[in-house]
Amino acid sequence: QDFEKERLKELNNKPAFFNDHERLTLIALGDLIIPKDEVSGSASDAKVIDFIDFIVKDIPEHQVPLRGGLKWLDLQCLNRYGKSFTASAANQQLEILEEIAYPTKVKPEMHQGAVFFSRLRNLVATGFYTSQIGIKDIGYVGNVPGRWEGVPADVLKQYNLTQVKYGV
């Protein structure tokens, strides 16, 4: 559709929504959500940050919750560790994420972080599993036509067609 092509061109011509610090934080979070393993690459290998940046330009309703969530996360780390999320040690990053990653176990004072993390986790998973790396990771091959083996023998027998010759 022409409208879709124009919209895609418009979105791709917009500057990046996230600043450098936000991008680095999102990349770090993405790799904690989907790390590289022996089967596939990480969220950053799949360029999930570019997907998320595209989505927030296409669906502006994500902008405030994501930017606000990133600020919330940095403030939590600054208050606890005196550093931003990306400057915090790996165990400190995981400590914060453990408190917001499981919605049914979240303390009331961490609710805002849990809402942010849930949205981000969904975007990271969507970005990853719609990338070439993610598609390969799940073994998706797309629509493949079935192989025609001819009319099954039981159907031929049912209609008394077992003596009929097919082909040339």
Regions found by a protein language model. Give the residues of each.
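N-terminal export signals
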Residues: 1-2, 89
